[in-house]
């Protein structure tokens, strides 16, 4: 597994070693020891989540606050998505900046998003199955979110805005300036 830290300290792109032959392929998708050595910290995952979405679905930008903050290790089992993490750590040099990573079943790339970040994704393929591990349990009272098209963030989703499919809840999320503080 190859680990590459992004411009956002603590966010890592993971590229697995894929062994292919005439039968198909094999890869190790997760190894706790390798993972913790690769990101340089101990993270223990307690929950796995999976979603299925169609082309144009944009989910996010979501996060959990305070003691319920979550780190996530995300990947795509089928299809292709643009995955986005936004730094919400107030003391960070990259506060308010984002990283976008193309995740697909073909490239098998994974993205580690630590605590203190908002997270969202846009489905680029006809359908996509999205899978992620969390290091903390979901807590409804601690959920936060930021509007996907916040002008301060200026995220380039590179997708026709009229074709986006967004939940009513996500359409009315606050902008970064008015969002619930992560800590």
Task: State each model region's role.
Residues 1-106, 125-127, 134-183:
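Non-catalytic, conserved peripheral segments adjacent to functional cores
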Residues 111, 119-124:
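Short beta-strand His + acidic residue motifs that chelate non-heme Fe in jelly-roll/DSBH
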């Amino acid at each position: 597994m190859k680990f590459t830290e992004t411009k956002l300290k603590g966010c890592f792109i993971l590229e697995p070693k894929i062994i292919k032959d005439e039968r198909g392929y094999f890869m190790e998708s997760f190894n706790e020891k390798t993972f913790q050595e690769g990101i340089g910290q101990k993270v223990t995952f307690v929950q796995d989540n999976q979603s299925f979405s169609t082309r144009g679905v944009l989910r996010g930008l979501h996060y959990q606050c305070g003691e319920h903050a979550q780190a996530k290790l995300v990947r795509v089992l089928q299809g292709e998505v643009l995955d986005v993490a936004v730094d919400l750590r107030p003391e960070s040099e990259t506060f308010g900046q984002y990283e976008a990573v193309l995740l697909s079943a073909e490239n098998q790339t994974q993205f580690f998003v630590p605590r203190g970040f908002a997270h969202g994704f846009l489905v680029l393929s006809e359908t996509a199955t999205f899978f992620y591990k969390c290091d903390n349990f979901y807590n409804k009272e601690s959920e936060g979110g930021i509007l996907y098209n916040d002008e301060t963030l200026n995220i380039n989703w590179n997708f026709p805005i009229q074709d986006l499919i967004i939940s009513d809840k996500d359409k009315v999320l606050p902008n970064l300036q008015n969002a619930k503080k992560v800590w």
